[in-house]
Amino acid sequence: MDVIQPCIKIQVHTKYIEEQSNPELQRFVFAYVITIKNLSQQTVQLISRRWLITDSNGKQMTVEGEGVVGQQPFIPSNDEYTYSSGTALETPVGVMQGHYKMLDEKGQEFITEIEPFRLAIPNVLN
């Protein structure tokens, strides 16, 4: 299994969901939109995901599962797949990172790393 696949690019956009959050109860909800761009010459399939979510107190949560949002999408060459999901933290700032396990046309599994990205309510410096 390859450690990294440079032909897959990941873009992440995050947003604080104020209407679902309750700071008094230490509940801060964030949405994220992820676009997976397949820059390779073959179709790939996203098989599973693994997230490490860390809040600003250092509390960590691992999330693993098949596919994303109930799907194991095929992503054709030079195409992209976008999905949205969310998470809740006990602090107003946190970080997510992880990886996708992918499968190429030859049946070879490889890992696509997802670089750390910040979850934060607006105007927080932490």
UniProtKB/Swiss-Prot annotation:
Alphabetical list of Pfam families matching this protein: DUF525
Q: Which PROSITE patterns match?
A: APAG
Report the residue ranges that make up the ApaG domain in this protein.
Answer: 2-126
A single BP term in Gene Ontology: error-free translesion synthesis
Domain of life of the native organism: Bacteria
S-S pairs: none
Please name the Gene3D superfamilies in this protein's record: ApaG domain
Q: What is this protein called?
A: Protein ApaG
- Which organism is this protein's natural source? Vibrio parahaemolyticus serotype O3:K6 (strain RIMD 2210633)
User: What is the primary gene name for this protein?
Assistant: apaG
